[in-house]
Amino acid sequence: MEYEFLKDVTGVVKVRMSMGHEAIGHWFNDEVNGHPEILAEVEAAIAGVKGSERQWQRVGREYTLLLDEEEVMIRANQLGFEGDDMEEGMNYYDEESLSFCGVEDFLAIIAAYRAFLLGR
């Protein structure tokens, strides 16, 4: 999994993720941007589920983060979209709406994101 942090001309940090992990970048950009306290909440939740079979969930404006001891899943809240109203032959594109990664990888992204924010 590859990622990149960018700062736009207004100073807003954007996270760009490799293919298959785009929803993680969207989560950082849409949910965390301007609310770094969310990262501490997620880290505390990871510590809280460690060694157990419990899960933890944080529902945001656009994305929901669900984690257990081993894996983090981020999905768009709109992913439950029903395609019944779509024309025949049309598909709902959701490749960028759902991503999975290991807890350790996710913690590494959080650490790198913080370091980027602090200019390290």
From Swiss-Prot:
Belongs to the UPF0231 family. Pfam families: UPF0231 (PF06062). This is UPF0231 protein ETA_08290.
